[in-house]
From Swiss-Prot:
Protein name per the record: Superoxide dismutase [Cu-Zn]
Stretches of the chain forming a coiled coil according to its record: none
Family: Belongs to the Cu-Zn superoxide dismutase family.
Any GO CC annotation of this UniProt entry: cytoplasm
Presence of the UniProt keyword Oxidoreductase in the record: yes
Post-translational modification N-acetylalanine, affected residues: A2
Organism: Capra hircus (Goat)
UniProt GO MF annotations: copper ion binding; superoxide dismutase activity
GO biological process, one term: reactive oxygen species metabolic process
C-alpha cells in the first residue's frame, strides 16, 4: 500500500510545479509549490483519468466516485477530487499545504494514476448559481497538470 505519491505539474505555458502527497492516518497531506501563476486563487482538483495524451483535457472530469455535485473541500457534498483553490502571491507562486480526509493513496478513493490539475480561474466551490458551478466550480481551463504516481 502506497503511503507517498508525487505529481509533476506541466502545461503549455509558464505554469509548473511539484506536489507531494503523504498518507497520515485517515487523511492525506498535500504539499508543494506551483510557479508561473497569475496572482490570486486557482482551482485545484484531481481529475478522473491519468490520460494526458491530449494535454490536460484528456484527464476527464473531476474524480467523483460517489456521483456527488461539485463543492468545496470542507463540504459534505463534493467530488473526491475537489481540493478547492491554491492562492498565488504577487510573484505567481502558490505554496500548497492541504490536509484532506476524502482522497486516499489506496482503495476505492485512491488518487494514484489520476491527474492533478491547476486551473486558470478560482473555484467557486459549487456556489456560482449555475449548472457549470455544480460540475467544475467555474474554474476555467487547465494551466498545468500531471499524473500522480507512487513515491518512495
Amino acid at each position: 500500500m502506497a503511503t507517498k505519491a508525487v505529481c509533476v505539474l506541466k502545461g503549455d505555458g509558464p505554469v509548473q510545479g511539484t506536489i507531494h502527497f503523504e498518507a497520515k492516518g485517515d487523511k492525506v497531506v498535500v504539499t508543494g509549490s506551483i510557479t508561473g501563476l497569475t496572482e490570486g486563487d486557482h482551482g485545484f482538483h484531481v481529475h478522473q483519468f491519468g490520460d494526458n495524451t491530449q494535454g490536460c483535457t484528456s484527464a476527464g472530469p473531476h474524480f467523483n466516485p460517489l456521483s456527488k455535485k461539485h463543492g468545496g473541500p470542507k463540504d459534505e457534498e463534493r467530488h473526491v477530487g475537489d481540493l478547492g483553490n491554491v492562492k498565488a502571491d504577487k510573484n505567481g507562486v502558490a505554496i500548497v499545504d492541504i490536509v484532506d480526509p476524502l482522497i486516499s493513496l489506496s482503495g476505492e478513493y485512491s488518487i494514484i494514476g489520476r491527474t492533478m490539475v491547476v486551473h486558470e480561474k478560482p473555484d467557486d466551490l459549487g456556489r456560482g448559481g449555475n449548472e457549470e458551478s455544480t460540475k467544475t466550480g467555474n474554474a476555467g481551463s487547465c494551466l498545468a497538470c500531471g499524473v500522480i504516481g507512487i513515491a518512495p
